[in-house]
Curated annotation (Swiss-Prot):
It comes from Homo sapiens. It comes from the Eukaryota. This is Uncharacterized protein C1orf185. It is a single-pass membrane protein. The gene is C1orf185. It is found in: Membrane.
Length: 199
């Protein structure tokens, strides 16, 4: 039988070996954890740098894609000139319509009547005068003129004296008669006569 002294020696030896192995194990575990923590930091930092690099790479690629799409659009328009011609025609038509609308707004709503009286040379036998009346209506853009031959009964003795004077001027009775005649003429008859003349 072994003595108890030898048993205690084996027990102490076994405990010392166990403590040494536990210490080595803890040291190995701590070093492994430290290694993993350092690697994790490196991996995290690398992932950040990679994400930043990818973003920086994507920005110029997007710019290239945009420039490429613009080039394709321009080249399509260059090869198909019809689209450009249609756009130019639409712009011209829109500008023309706008100019017409502005012009029609600037014009007065009522027609202006210009009365021009030109006495012609009178002969001793006929004793007649011609009065030319030109009427212009701006809103409808149709211009027409009418010439009226007035007989001697239009003029009174005073108007004949004034007509033979060196400075011819229109008297009040003449103007009244002209305006009374114009009031009898309807604008519809004038426009119909102008349309018949143009046709």
């Amino acid at each position: 039988m072994a003595s108890p002294k030898g048993f205690f020696n084996y027990l102490t030896y076994f405990l010392a070996a166990g403590a040494v192995t536990l210490g080595i194990g803890f040291f190995a575990l701590a070093s492994a954890l430290w290694f993993l923590i350092c690697k994790r930091r490196e991996i995290f930092q690398n992932s950040k740098f990679k994400a930043i690099d990818e973003r920086c790479r994507q920005r110029p690629s997007m710019a290239k894609i945009k420039s490429h799409s613009q080039c394709v659009f321009i080249s399509r328009n260059f090869h198909t000139g019809r689209f450009q011609l249609q756009e130019e025609q639409r712009k011209k038509e829109a500008a023309h319509i706008k100019a017409i609308k502005d012009h029609s707004k600037d014009e007065p709503q009522l027609a202006t009547k210009n009365i021009i009286c030109d006495p012609s040379e009178t002969s001793s036998t006929t004793n007649r005068s011609s009065v030319t009346l030109s009427l212009s209506t701006l809103p409808s853009d149709s211009y027409y003129s009418q010439s009226i031959e007035a007989a001697d009964d239009w003029f009174s003795d005073d108007s004949l004296v004034k007509r033979n004077s060196p400075m011819p001027s229109l008297g009040e009775p003449l103007m009244e008669k002209v305006f009374s005649y114009l009031s009898t003429i309807s604008l519809e008859e004038g426009t119909e006569s102008v349309l018949n003349d143009t046709l």
